[in-house]
A protein has these predicted regions:
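Glycine- and hydrophobic-rich flexible loops that cap the catalytic core of alpha/beta enzyme folds
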Residues: 1-120, 124-127, 363-365, 370-415
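Active-site-adjacent structural elements in folded domains
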Residues: 3-10, 17-23, 176-187, 257, ...
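Secondary-structure capping and boundary motifs in well-ordered enzyme cores
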Residues: 16-19, 27-34, 188-193, 209, ...
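Composition- and surface-driven signal marking solvent-exposed, interaction-prone regions
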Residues: 39, 51-56, 209-219, 229-235, ...
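Short, well-ordered loop/turn and helix-capping segments at boundaries between secondary-structure elements
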Residues: 44, 48, 60-65, 206, ...
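A cross-family structural signal marking well-folded subdomains
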Residues: 52-55, 65-69, 78-79, 83-286, ...
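Intrinsically disordered, low-complexity N-proximal targeting/linker segments that flank membranes
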Residues: 222-343, 347-353, 359
Length: 416
C-alpha cells in the first residue's frame, strides 16, 4: 500500500488497465495422480515448492485415490495444513529461531524432527539422525505405498494431527524463551543440539517438559556435544527410551549415557575448568553458577537485539603475554610468562561479559577494567573485585568452579 500511495493518478490508471486485461484461467485435471504431479512440477510463483506444499499434496492424493477424500478427509488435511502453515509463519518470525534452529533452518527441519519422534501404526520408523529432509520425505512416500488401504485413512488422520501438534509445540518452546529463565538459558545460552529435538518436542507435546528435565537436556547436551565428542546417534536415539518407558525412562537413559561417557567426573570437571576459553558451554555454566539471582527480566536485558551475544572476557588480558612484561607478570603473582600461559585461558581468568563492554575493555589494565565491569548488566560482574585480582584469586576461582561442577552441576552423572 505504501508504494501505491506514492503513485500519480496516471500511473494508477495504467496499472488498473493492465489488471482489467488480465484473464483468470481455470485448469482442471480429473485424474488426482496427474493433478498432484502437475502441481509439484508447475510452479508459477518462481520459487521452489515448500516441503509442506509437497507433503500436503501427497496426502491429498492418497486421500482422493484410496480413501474417497470427498467424504471429509480432504477437508481434514486442508484444515490442518492451513493451521500448520500459520504456525510455521509465526516460527519464522520468532526472534530466536536462528539461534535455536540454526542459520539455515526451514520448515523441513521440523518435519524431519517429527519423523523421528513417533512410531505410527502401519509404517516403519521414519527417523534417522543422518537422514536429510528430502530423503525422509521420500521414505514417507515409500511407506505410504505399503500401508493397507483399510488403515490408510486412520494413518493420515493421526499423522496430520500429530504433525500439527509437533509444529505447535515447537512454537510454544520458542515462545517460552521470552517467559521462562530456564528455557532462555537452556535454548538460547546453551543452544541445545537439534538432535535432541525429536525427544524434546515430544515431551513438550505431552506436557512433560518441566524445568528439571530441560536442565537435564542442557547438561546432557554438554556431555554429548560440548566436551570433545559428538554423540549424534546416542542423542537422537533417546526417543526410543521415551516411547518405550516414558519420561522417567528417558531421564534414566540420559543419566546412564552421561555416566558412561564421563567415567571420571573429577577429570571431566578439571578439563572443563582448564579449557574454559575453548569450551562452547562456558556461558551456560557461568550463568548457572554465578547468576541464579538474575530473573527473566534481567536475563532478557542481555539480548537487546534478540540474539545472545555475551563474550568470554580475559580478566588478565592476553596482550600481557605479547608485551612480555616480566615485572608486571610477577606483580600479579606469576613466576614468569610460561606460568601465566598455563592459566590465561582457564575458568578463573574468565567472565561472561557483554560484547560492547568486552570490546571496550580489550587490553585495558585491571583498574580500567574495574570501571568497565561496573557497567555490566550482570550483578556478578558488577561486584567482581578486578583491582585486586591476582594468581591466587584466579586459582581460587578455578578450585571453586571445579568443586561446584563435581558436587552440583554433574552430581547426577557421578558413578555410584
Amino acid at each position: 500500500m505504501d508504494k501505491i500511495s506514492k503513485l500519480s493518478k496516471e500511473e494508477v490508471n495504467e496499472r488498473l488497465e493492465v489488471l482489467l486485461k488480465m484473464v483468470l484461467m481455470r485448469l482442471e485435471e480429473p485424474d488426482p495422480g496427474r493433478a498432484i504431479r502437475t502441481f509439484q512440477s508447475v510452479n508459477d510463483r518462481g520459487v521452489p515448492l515448500l516441503l509442506l506444499d509437497k507433503l500436503k499434496s501427497l496426502l491429498i492424493y492418497y486421500s482422493n485415490t484410496f480413501c474417497n477424500g470427498k467424504r471429509g478427509l480432504d477437508q481434514f488435511i486442508n484444515d490442518h495444513f492451513g493451521e500448520i502453515f500459520k504456525i510455521f509463519a509465526k516460527i519464522k518470525k520468532s526472534d530466536h529461531i536462528s539461534s535455536v534452529g540454526g542459520s539455515k533452518f526451514d520448515e523441513g527441519d521440523i518435519f524431519r524432527y517429527h519423523a523421528g519422534s513417533q512410531r505410527f501404526d502401519g509404517i516403519e520408523f521414519l527417523g534417522h539422525y543422518a537422514t536429510s529432509t528430502e530423503d525422509t520425505y521420500e521414505k514417507l512416500k515409500d511407506e505410504l505405498k505399503e500401508i493397507k488401504k483399510s488403515k490408510l485413512k486412520s494413518f493420515i488422520q493421526s499423522y496430520v494431527s500429530d504433525l500439527k501438534n509437533f509444529y505447535q509445540a515447537f512454537l510454544d518452546l520458542l515462545s517460552e524463551i521470552d517467559t521462562s529463565p530456564t528455557t532462555l538459558k537452556a535454548m538460547l545460552i546453551n543452544t541445545i543440539n537439534p538432535l535432541f529435538f525429536n525427544s524434546l518436542i515430544r515431551l513438550k507435546i505431552n506436557n512433560e517438559l518441566d524445568d528439571e528435565t530441560l536442565r537435564l537436556f542442557a547438561k546432557t547436551d554438554i556431555v554429548f556435544f560440548k566436551s570433545g565428542k559428538k554423540m549424534r546417534t546416542t542423542a537422537y536415539n533417546l526417543i526410543d527410551e521415551y516411547l518405550e518407558k516414558g519420561k522417567e525412562g528417558l531421564k534414566s537413559e540420559m543419566i546412564a549415557q552421561c555416566r558412561n561417557d564421563i567415567e571420571d567426573i573429577e577429570l571431566a570437571s578439571l578439563k572443563l575448568v582448564k579449557n574454559a576459553f575453548n569450551s562452547s558451554c562456558f556461558h551456560y555454566v557461568f550463568f548457572e553458577k554465578n547468576c541464579q539471582e538474575m530473573g527473566l527480566a534481567d536475563l532478557k536485558k542481555l539480548i537487546p537485539e534478540k540474539q545472545f551475544s555475551q563474550e568470554k572476557e580475559h580478566i588478565i588480558p592476553i596482550n600481557l603475554l605479547k608485551l612480555d612484561n616480566e615485572i608486571k607478570i610477577q606483580e600479579l603473582g606469576f613466576e614468569d610468562k610460561k606460568d601465566l600461559e598455563n592459566y590465561i585461558d582457564t575458568y578463573g581468568n574468565l567472565i561472561s561479559l557483554e560484547k560492547p563492554l568486552n570490546s571496550k575493555g580489550k587490553d585495558k589494565d585491571l583498574y580500567e577494567k574495574n570501571e568497565i565491569y561496573k557497567s555490566s548488566k550482570i550483578p556478578f560482574n558488577r561486584r567482581f573485585n578486578v583491582k585486586d585480582f591476582k594468581k591466587e584469586v584466579l586459582i581460587e576461582r578455578n578450585n571453586k568452579m571445579e568443586k561446584w561442577l563435581i558436587n552440583t552441576f554433574f552430581k547426577d552423572f557421578a558413578a555410584h
